[in-house]
C-alpha cells in the first residue's frame, strides 16, 4: 500500500483504501495537519475555508513538506486564533479578541493555560520567526480543550447515560472529559446491545424481520451463529477506536437510518481492511451530516497517536453535541423495533451514585427507583443532559469524588490546594456533597474533567482528612434529614423547568435539569430563602468539637462568620450570582493541566479584594472539584434536611452561587481567615512551578469556610441564557498574578491588623488611665461609678473607632476581612486570636471566610465588647479595693520610712526584675502601649498564663542605669506587670482557666510621682520581686529588651487581667508575714536596675481576703510572705516596703545570687563555647580526615590502576613468553648452545657461498623488495597494537627507515587470519602455537623474498622442502635488517628449537644468536620489524648478529655449494 494522496480527499471505496504504512506515517506532521485543519475550520467555518488553507502543507523542490506561508502568516498574526477564539470563547461578544495575548487571556479566564512542555506559552513564543510550531500546537490544543468542555460535560454525559442505562454504580462515574466520552460510548453501546438482544429474540418469533440483517458484514460470521454483533468496550479512547467499531456503532445508535448496522463491520477480530472500512464510513458520515467535524485522515484514526488525543476528544465532544444537544432530524436514537419499547428507558434512571448508595442504605430502594427517577429520566432524555449554565465549567465533574487513574495532561499546568480544617470534619462530613449543584458551571477544568492527564497530581484527600469515606460521605444523607421532602436546594431548578436549549457561545446547547431525589423538578428557593436556610441551618454544623478546636487554628468564631456569610449573601444580588456562575475555577493539582483559577472579573473588584479573590478561586476549587459528587449529591441531598446542605464545606458551593456565597462582587465578602490565607499561600506556592492555579480535588470545601447552602442559590434562569458570562473567563488573567497580589494583600492586612490593634490598645490605655486616675482620686471610696463609666466610655470609644475603621476598611475590599478578623478577635474576649495552639477559638471565627458582611457583626461585637467592659469594671473594682489597702499601707510605710529611698545599683537588680518592670511598663503604660505584638494573634510571650497581672504606674526621679541588655532601670520604681500577651489584654484575654491556667492574680501598680513614701514601698516591692519573679518567671524573662517607659508620666496601666478563679491564690498568713527577714529564696532573676517609678504592687488575691486589707504590718513583712507564696503557689505576688536593713540584706542576697548566677552563666557560656569550639574542631578534623581519606582513596585508586596496568602488561609479556615456552630459561642452556656455535658459524660460512652462487639475484631482489618494508618496520615499535604488549622492549631506531613506523602495526593487523597473532583490538595477543604459519611463509617467499621469475627455481625448491617438512612453524633467516633472504628454518615453539631446512645459515639458531624479529604483512607484502626480544610462533623471520655472518665469509663458497646441493 503505497502513499496515498491526502487521505481526507479519499472517497470510501469497498476496496481497501490506500494508506500510508506505519513506518512512513509522520506523527508530527499528522498532529500539525489535524490541529490546523480544526483551527481553520473553526476560524472560517467548514464551508468557507479558503482554498489555500485547505491543505496547510506544500512540497518544495527537494520533496520536503513545509507549512504554507499564508498559514504561517495567519498563525503569527493571530488571525486564526482570534477568529476561532471569538467563536469558542465568546464570553464577551462586544469585545472581540485581538492578538495572541487576548486569546491567551481569554483561555486563562476559562482556566486553561497554554503550556508547552510545562512552560507557559507567551505572545513572544507565538510571534517567533521562524515559527515555533510547538507553541502554536499548544495554543490550538488549549483552544480545543476549551471547545471540548463547551461541547460536553460530565453531567451531560451522566444525564445522557441515564436515559440508556437502568442502573449505575458509583465506580462507573466518569471523572474527566476523556473518561466521560468513553463512559458515554460504552453506555450507549451497551444499550444498543440490549436493543439488539431483544430484537434478536423477537426475530426468532418474527422471522420476517430477520432478513433485515442479511446485509450486515458481520452476519456471515456471527448472525448465523445467533451471536450479537461484537461491539467492543472502549477502555482506551484512542487505541480502542482504531477499528472504528465502537464509534460506528455509536453513530448507528443515534442515526440508525443513516448508518445502518448492516453497513458496519463488527467482528471479533478486525482486520486492517475492516478497520479502514469502518473508519471510512465514519468519515463519510461526518462529512455529509456533521459539517465536516472529523478532521482526521484514515491514518490518524487508524494509528491513533497519543499526540492527537486532544483532537480526538474535541471530535467526540462535537459528536456528543450533535447527538445529544443539537439533535438534528436525522438523529433518532434507535429503539427496539419489534415492540417499540425502550427497555432501558423503561428502567428508572438512577442518579449515578444514589443507586449504589441506596442499595446499601435503603431496603426499599428498588421500589423508589421507578418513582423517583422516571421523571428525571424522561426530562433528561428530552433535554439531552442535565443543564449546565452556558459557561459549562470546563471540566467540572466528579473530580474530587474519588481518585481514578491519573492521566497525562493536555497542555495545562496546575497544582492542588488542599485545606484540611478540623472543625469541618464533624459536621460537614455527612453534608459534604450537598452543595455540588448540577449547575456547577463556573468550574474550570476540574480534575475529573480535565483529561485524564489533567488529574495527574491531584490529591484526593478530603478536606477533613477522611479520605476513605469521601465517596460515601458525600452521598450520605443525614439521617435526620427528611428524605421525603424534596428540598429546593438547587437553583438549578430554574433550569430544570426549562426544556429549552440554550445556545452556548460556540453553538453548543446546554440543557440543565434539576431534579430532586425523587426525580421531581425542584423549585429553587429565592436567594433570600437560600440565605435564610443557610443562616438557620448552618450554625449547628459549624459548632466544632473541642478536639477540633484544639487541633486547628480558628481565627474567628463561627457564629460571627456565619452571620457575616448570611449577611453578605443577602447583600449579593442575583445578578452577582449570575455573574459568578462561572466564577471560580477549581485548581487541579496536576502539573500538566490546562486548568487555572477562574475568577469572575465582573464579580471581583479591580482591587481584587483579597478575600474575594482567595475565596473565589478556593471556592471554585471546591465547587468545581466535585461535579460528579455534586450531581449525585444534588439528587441525594435535595431530599435531605436543609441542615445537611449546610455542612460547613463551602467547597461544595457551586460556582454559580458563589457570587452570593463568596461575594465575589465588589462588595467582597471576606471569606478567608489570615491563617487560611497563609495556608493557601503555602499550598499555592507549592504549585507555583506548575504554571497554573491548582484545583482542589477534595469534595469538601470546608477549608473554604463557605456555607454549603450558598450553592443552592444557583444562577437564576437568565444565567443559563447568558453564555457570555462564562465563569471560567472571569479574571483568569488577573489570577495569574494572584499569588503575588495575595502576598501583598496579606501584608496589607497584617499591617491593618496591627494598626487596628494599636488603636484599640491606645483606647484601652486611655480608658485604663482614666480608670486609674479615678481610683487615685477616690482611693478610699469603693468602686467608682465614674471609673466604670470611663471604662465603658473608653470601650465605647474604642469600639466606635474600630467600627469606623471597619467601615472604612469595608470600603477597601482587601482589608475588610482582616478588619473583620481583628474586630471579632478584639471584641469577643472568649474567642481571641488563637495563633497560639493553646488558645483555641470558636471555629466559626475560623469560618470568617464565609462571613459576608461585617456590619451585621456590630450587634454581636457590642455584646461581647460590653462583656469585656464589665470584666474590666470588675477588675477596676478589685483595683479600687486594692487602692484602699494600699493607701493604708502607704500611710504606715510613710511613717516608717518617710524619707528613705535606696537605689539598686545596676548590677544588683536581677534582669528578670528589669524585664518585669519593662513588661508592665510596656504593657500597662500608655507610653509603652503602642501596638502590642501581643495584640497580634500570636502572644509574644510563650507563657502568658503564668504572667501575673500588674500595671505600670508612676515613676520617680531616680536615675536609670543603662543595662547592657538595653534595659534602663529606674532604681526606686519596680513595676511587675506581666509580659504582654494575648491574655494580658482583656480584649484578647481568654477567661477559660484552661487557657490561662497560671494567671491567678491581677496586680495594680500605681503610685504618686513625687511621694518619697513610695520609695520605701518600692524597695519592698523590689525585694518581693524576686519572689514574684519565681511566679512569673516565664513571662519575666521574655521581654528583657522592651523599651523602658518614662517613669514620670506613666500614671496608668491597663488592667491586664482578672485573677483567674481556677488558680489557687494563697494569701500570706500572718505567720508568713512574720518572716520578713527570710531571704528571697528565688534570686533566680538577675536584678534589674531599679526604676524611678514609684509603684506599689499588690496582688489582687490579697485584696480578696478582707483581713489582709486590715493588716498593714503584713505588708511590711509581705516580701518574705510573698516569697513563701511564690514558693508555694508562684501565683500571688505583691510588693511591700520593708526596713532598710531587710532591704539591704535582701539586696545583698540578691547580689550574691546574681553574682552566682552570672558566674554560672559565664561558666555555662564558657563551657558552651568550649563545646562549640570542640565541635568545630571536631568538624574540622572530620573534614580534614575525610579530605585525607578522599585523597588517600584517590591515590590508592591511582596506584591500584597503575598496578593493574603493570600487572596486565606483565601478564601480557608472560603470555607471550609462555606461548613460546621461553619463560626466561636459565643461562646454562645458553652455555650449552655456545658449544654449538662454532659449528653453526663454521657451517654458516661454509654455506654462505650458496647465496652468492645461486642467489645474487635473489638477495638483490629481496633487498629491493624488502628493504622498504623492513626499513618501514624498524621504527614500528612506536605505537602499534602489539607494541602495547611489549612496550618495554621498543627499539625506536634500529636503523633509519622511511615509513617504517606503521609497518608493524599494519603487518600485525592486516596479516592473514591464519597467523592468528596480529593485534585485533583489546586482545593483545592471540595464541598461535597450535596454528601453522606455513602459508604465510609461502606467501612471503613467493611475493616478497623470492618474487619474480629470476628466483623461480630457488622458490620452488624451498617450497618443496617446506612441503616435505612436518613442521608447523617456519622462520626465514635474513642477512640483516635489509631483509635479504638467506635460508629457511623450522621452529618448534614447544622446544624452542630452530633448525635449518634449506639455505645459507647456521644449522641451528639459539636465542642468543637472534638479533631481530620480523613479521610478514600479507597485504603489504612486506616484513615489519617486531619490537620484541622474545621469539614466538607469531614471528615469521629473524636476523642474527652480524658477527656470526662475517667469519670466513669469502671462504670457498663453490666447494660447499655442490655438497650442500
Swiss-Prot record:
It comes from the Eukaryota. Residues 361-389, 573-613, 639-704, 787-855, 921-992, 1004-1044, 1069-1090, 1102-1124, 1163-1321 are annotated as: Disordered. InterPro entries: CAMSAP (IPR032940), CAMSAP-like_CH_dom (IPR022613), CAMSAP_CC1 (IPR031372), CH_dom (IPR001715), CH_dom_sf (IPR036872), CKK_dom_sf (IPR038209), CKK_domain (IPR014797), PRC_barrel-like_sf (IPR011033). One of its GO terms (cellular component) is microtubule minus-end. Gene3D superfamilies: CKK domain. Residues 896-1007 are annotated as: MBD region. GO terms for biological process: axon development; microtubule cytoskeleton organization; regulation of dendrite development; regulation of Golgi organization; regulation of microtubule polymerization; regulation of organelle organization. PROSITE patterns: CH, CKK. Keywords: Cell projection, Coiled coil, Cytoplasm, Cytoskeleton, Golgi apparatus, Microtubule, Phosphoprotein. Residues 1077-1089 have a biased composition (Pro residues). Belongs to the CAMSAP1 family. Interacts with CAMSAP3. Interacts with KATNA1 and KATNB1; leading to regulate the length of CAMSAP2-decorated microtubule stretches. Interacts with a complex formed by AKAP9 and PDE4DIP isoform 2/MMG8/SMYLE, which recruits CAMSAP2 to the Golgi. Interacts with MAPRE1/EB1. Key microtubule-organizing protein that specifically binds the minus-end of non-centrosomal microtubules and regulates their dynamics and organization. Specifically recognizes growing microtubule minus-ends and autonomously decorates and stabilizes microtubule lattice formed by microtubule minus-end polymerization. Acts on free microtubule minus-ends that are not capped by microtubule-nucleating proteins or other factors and protects microtubule minus-ends from depolymerization. In addition, it also reduces the velocity of microtubule polymerization. This is Calmodulin-regulated spectrin-associated protein 2. It comes from Mus musculus. The gene is Camsap2.
Amino acid at each position: 500500500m503505497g502513499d496515498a494522496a491526502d487521505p481526507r480527499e479519499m472517497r470510501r471505496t469497498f476496496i481497501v483504501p490506500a494508506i500510508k504504512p506505519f513506518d512512513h506515517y509522520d506523527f508530527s506532521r499528522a498532529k500539525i495537519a489535524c490541529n490546523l485543519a480544526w483551527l481553520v475550520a473553526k476560524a472560517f467555518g467548514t464551508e468557507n475555508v479558503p482554498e489555500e488553507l485547505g491543505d496547510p502543507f506544500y512540497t518544495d523542490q527537494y520533496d520536503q513538506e513545509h507549512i504554507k506561508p499564508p498559514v504561517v502568516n495567519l498563525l503569527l498574526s493571530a488571525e486564526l486564533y482570534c477568529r476561532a477564539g471569538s467563536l469558542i470563547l465568546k464570553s464577551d461578544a462586544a469585545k472581540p479578541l485581538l492578538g495572541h495575548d487576548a486569546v491567551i487571556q481569554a483561555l486563562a479566564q476559562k482556566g486553561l493555560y497554554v503550556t508547552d512542555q510545562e512552560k507557559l506559552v507567551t505572545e513572544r513564543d507565538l510571534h517567533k520567526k521562524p515559527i515555533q510550531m510547538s507553541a502554536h500546537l499548544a495554543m490550538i490544543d488549549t483552544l480545543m480543550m476549551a471547545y471540548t468542555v463547551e461541547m460536553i460535560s460530565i453531567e451531560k454525559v451522566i444525564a445522557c447515560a441515564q436515559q440508556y442505562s437502568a442502573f449505575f454504580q458509583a465506580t462507573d462515574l466518569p471523572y474527566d472529559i476523556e473518561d466521560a466520552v468513553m463512559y458515554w460510548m460504552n453506555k450507549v453501546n451497551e444499550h444498543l446491545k440490549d436493543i439488539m438482544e431483544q430484537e434478536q429474540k423477537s426475530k426468532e418469533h418474527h422471522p420476517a424481520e430477520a432478513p433485515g440483517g442479511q446485509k450486515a458484514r458481520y452476519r456471515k460470521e456471527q448472525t448465523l451463529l445467533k451471536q450479537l454483533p461484537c461491539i467492543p468496550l472502549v477502555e482506551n479512547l484512542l487505541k480502542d477506536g482504531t477499528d472504528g467499531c465502537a464509534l460506528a456503532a455509536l453513530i448507528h445508535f443515534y442515526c440508525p437510518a443513516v448508518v445502518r448496522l448492516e453497513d458496519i463491520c463488527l467482528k471479533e477480530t478486525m482486520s486492517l481492511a475492516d478497520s479502514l472500512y469502518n473508519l471510512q464510513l465514519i468519515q463519510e458520515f461526518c462529512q455529509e451530516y456533521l459539517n465536516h467535524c472529523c478532521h482526521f485522515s484514515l491514518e490518524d484514526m487508524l494509528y491513533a497517536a497519543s499526540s492527537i488525543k486532544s483532537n480526538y476528544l474535541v471530535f467526540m465532544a462535537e459528536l456528543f453535541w450533535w447527538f445529544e444537544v443539537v439533535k438534528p432530524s436525522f438523529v433518532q436514537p434507535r429503539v427496539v423495533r419489534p415492540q417499540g419499547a425502550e427497555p432501558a428507558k423503561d428502567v428508572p434512571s438512577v442518579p449515578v451514585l444514589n443507586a449504589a448508595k441506596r442499595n446499601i442504605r435503603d431496603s426499599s430502594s428498588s421500589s423508589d427507583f421507578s418513582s423517583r427517577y422516571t421523571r428525571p429520566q424522561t426530562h433528561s432524555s428530552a433535554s439531552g443532559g442535565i443543564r449546565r449554565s452556558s459557561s459549562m465549567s470546563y471540566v467540572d465533574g466528579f473530580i474530587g469524588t474519588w481518585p481514578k487513574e491519573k492521566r497525562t495532561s493536555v497542555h495545562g499546568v496546575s497544582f492542588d490546594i488542599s485545606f484540611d480544617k478540623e472543625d469541618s470534619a464533624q459536621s460537614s462530613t455527612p453534608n459534604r456533597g450537598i452543595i455540588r449543584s448540577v449547575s456547577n458551571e463556573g468550574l474550570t477544568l476540574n480534575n475529573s474533567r480535565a483529561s485524564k492527564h489533567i488529574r495527574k497530581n491531584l490529591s484526593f484527600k478530603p478536606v477533613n482528612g477522611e479520605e476513605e469515606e469521601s465517596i460515601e460521605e458525600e452521598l450520605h444523607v443525614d439521617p435526620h434529614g427528611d428524605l421525603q421532602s424534596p428540598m429546593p436546594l438547587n437553583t438549578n431548578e430554574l433550569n430544570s423547568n426549562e426544556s429549552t436549549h440554550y445556545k452556548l457561545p460556540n453553538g453548543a446547547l446546554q440543557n440543565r435539569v434539576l431534579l430532586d431525589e425523587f426525580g421531581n423538578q425542584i423549585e429553587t428557593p429565592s436567594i433570600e430563602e437560600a440565605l435564610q436556610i443557610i443562616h438557620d441551618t448552618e450554625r449547628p454544623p459549624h459548632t466544632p468539637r473541642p478536639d477540633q478546636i484544639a487541633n486547628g487554628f480558628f481565627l474567628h468564631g463561627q457564629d460571627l462568620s456565619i452571620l457575616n456569610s448570611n449577611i453578605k449573601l443577602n447583600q449579593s444580588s442575583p445578578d452577582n450570582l449570575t455573574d459568578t456562575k462561572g466564577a471560580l475555577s477549581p485548581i487541579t493539582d496536576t502539573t500538566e493541566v490546562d486548568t487555572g483559577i477562574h475568577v469572575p472579573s465582573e464579580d471581583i473588584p479591580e482591587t481584587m479584594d483579597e478575600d474575594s479573590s482567595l475565596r473565589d478561586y478556593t471556592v471554585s476549587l471546591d465547587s468545581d472539584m466535585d461535579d460528579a459528587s455534586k450531581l449525585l449529591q444534588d439528587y441525594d441531598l435535595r431530599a435531605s434536611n436543609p441542615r445537611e446542605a449546610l455542612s460547613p464545606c463551602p467547597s461544595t458551593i457551586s460556582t454559580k452561587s458563589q457570587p452570593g456565597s463568596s461575594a465575589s462582587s465588589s462588595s467582597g465578602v471576606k471569606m478567608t481567615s489570615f491563617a487560611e490565607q497563609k495556608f493557601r499561600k503555602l499550598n499555592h506556592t507549592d504549585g507555583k512551578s506548575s504554571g497554573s492555579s491548582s484545583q482542589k480535588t477534595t469534595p469538601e470545601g470546608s477549608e473554604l469556610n463557605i456555607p454549603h447552602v450558598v450553592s443552592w442559590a444557583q444562577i437564576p434562569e437568565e444565567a443559563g441564557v447568558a453564555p457570555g458570562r462564562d465563569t471560567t473567563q472571569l479574571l483568569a488573567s488577573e489570577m495569574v498574578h494572584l499569588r503575588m497580589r495575595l502576598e501583598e494583600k496579606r501584608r496589607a492586612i497584617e499591617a491593618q491588623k496591627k494598626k487596628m490593634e494599636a488603636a484599640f490598645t491606645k483606647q484601652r490605655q486611655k480608658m485604663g488611665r482614666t480608670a486609674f486616675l479615678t481610683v487615685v482620686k477616690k482611693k478610699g471610696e469603693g468602686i467608682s461609678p465614674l471609673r466604670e463609666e470611663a471604662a465603658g466610655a473608653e470601650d465605647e470609644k474604642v469600639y466606635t473607632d474600630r467600627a469606623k475603621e471597619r467601615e472604612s476598611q469595608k470600603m477597601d475590599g482587601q482589608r475588610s476581612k482582616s478588619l473583620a478578623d481583628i474586630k471579632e478577635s478584639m471584641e469577643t474576649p472568649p474567642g481571641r486570636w488563637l495563633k497560639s495552639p493553646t488558645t483555641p477559638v470558636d471555629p466559626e471565627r475560623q469560618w470568617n471566610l464565609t462571613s459576608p458582611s461585617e456590619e451585621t457583626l456590630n450587634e454581636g461585637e457590642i455584646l461581647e465588647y460590653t462583656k469585656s467592659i464589665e470584666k474590666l469594671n470588675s477588675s477596676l473594682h478589685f483595683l479600687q479595693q486594692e487602692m484602699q489597702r494600699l493607701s493604708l499601707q502607704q500611710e504606715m510605710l510613710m511613717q516608717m520610712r518617710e524619707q528613705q529611698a535606696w537605689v539598686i545599683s545596676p548590677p544588683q537588680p536581677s534582669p528578670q526584675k528589669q524585664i518585669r518592670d519593662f513588661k508592665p511598663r510596656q504593657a500597662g503604660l500608655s507610653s509603652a502601649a503602642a501596638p502590642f505584638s501581643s495584640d497580634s494573634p500570636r502572644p509574644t510571650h510563650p507563657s502568658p498564663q503564668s504572667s501575673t497581672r500588674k500595671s505600670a504606674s508612676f515613676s520617680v526621679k531616680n536615675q536609670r542605669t543603662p543595662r547592657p541588655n538595653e534595659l534602663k532601670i529606674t532604681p526606686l520604681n519596680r513595676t511587675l506587670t506581666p509580659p504582654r500577651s494575648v491574655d494580658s489584654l482583656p480584649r484578647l484575654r481568654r477567661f477559660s482557666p484552661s487557657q490561662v491556667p497560671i494567671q491567678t492574680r491581677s496586680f495594680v501598680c500605681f503610685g504618686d510621682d513625687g511621694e518619697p513614701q513610695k520609695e520605701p514601698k518600692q524597695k519592698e516591692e523590689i525585694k518581693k520581686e524576686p519572689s514574684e519573679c519565681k511566679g512569673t518567671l516565664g513571662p519575666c524573662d521574655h521581654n528583657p529588651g522592651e523599651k523602658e517607659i518614662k517613669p514620670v508620666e506613666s500614671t496608668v496601666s491597663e488592667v491586664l487581667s482578672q485573677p483567674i478563679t481556677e488558680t489557687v491564690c494563697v494569701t500570706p498568713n500572718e505567720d508568713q508575714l512574720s518572716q520578713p527577714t527570710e531571704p528571697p529564696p528565688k534570686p533566680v532573676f538577675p536584678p534589674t536596675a531599679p526604676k524611678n517609678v514609684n509603684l506599689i504592687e499588690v496582688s489582687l488575691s490579697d485584696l480578696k481576703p478582707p483581713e489582709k486589707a486590715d493588716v498593714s504590718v503584713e505588708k511590711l513583712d509581705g516580701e518574705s510572705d510573698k516569697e513563701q507564696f511564690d514558693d508555694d503557689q508562684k501565683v500571688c505576688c505583691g510588693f511591700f516596703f520593708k526596713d532598710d536593713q531587710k532591704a539591704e540584706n535582701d539586696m545583698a542576697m540578691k547580689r550574691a545570687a546574681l553574682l552566682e548566677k552570672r558566674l554560672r552563666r559565664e561558666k555555662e557560656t564558657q563551657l558552651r563555647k568550649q563545646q562549640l569550639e570542640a565541635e568545630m574542631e571536631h568538624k574540622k578534623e572530620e573534614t580534614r580526615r575525610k579530605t585525607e581519606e578522599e585523597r588517600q582513596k584517590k591515590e590508592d585508586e591511582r596506584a591500584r590502576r597503575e598496578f593493574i596496568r603493570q600487572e596486565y602488561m606483565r601478564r601480557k609479556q608472560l603470555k607471550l613468553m609462555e606461548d613460546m615456552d621461553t619463560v626466561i630459561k636459565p643461562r646454562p642452556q645458553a652455555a650449552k648452545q655456545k658449544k654449538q656455535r662454532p659449528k653453526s658459524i663454521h657451517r654458516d660460512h661454509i654455506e654462505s657461498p650458496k647465496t652468492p652462487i645461486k642467489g645474487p639475484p635473489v638477495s638483490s631482489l629481496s633487498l629491493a623488495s624488502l628493504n622498504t618494508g623492513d626499513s618501514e618496520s624498524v621504527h614500528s615499535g612506536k605505537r602499534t597494537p602489539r607494541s602495547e604488549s611489549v612496550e618495554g622492549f621498543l627499539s625506536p631506531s634500529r636503523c633509519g627507515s622511511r615509513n617504517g613506523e606503521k609497518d608493524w602495526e599494519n603487518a600485525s593487523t592486516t596479516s592473514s587470519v591464519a597467523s592468528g597473532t596480529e593485534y585485533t583490538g583489546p586482545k593483545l595477543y592471540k595464541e598461535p602455537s597450535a596454528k601453522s604459519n606455513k602459508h604465510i611463509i609461502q606467501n612471503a617467499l613467493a611475493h616478497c623474498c623470492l618474487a619474480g621469475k629470476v628466483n623461480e627455481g630457488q622458490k620452488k625448491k624451498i617450497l618443496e622442502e617446506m612441503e616435505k617438512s612436518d613442521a608447523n612453524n617456519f622462520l626465514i633467516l635474513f642477512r640483516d635488517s635489509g631483509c635479504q633472504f638467506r635460508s629457511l628454518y623450522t621452529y618448534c615453539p614447544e622446544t624452542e628449537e630452530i633448525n635449518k631446512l634449506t639455505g645459507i645459515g647456521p644449522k641451528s639458531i639459539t636465542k642468543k644468536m637472534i638479533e631481530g624479529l620480523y613479521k610478514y604483512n600479507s597485504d603489504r607484502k612486506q616484513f615489519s620489524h617486531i619490537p620484541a626480544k622474545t621469539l614466538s610462533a607469531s614471528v615469521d623471520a629473524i636476523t642474527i648478529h652480524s658477527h656470526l655472518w662475517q667469519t670466513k665469509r669469502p671462504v670457498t663458497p663453490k666447494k660447499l655449494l655442490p655438497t650442500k646441493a
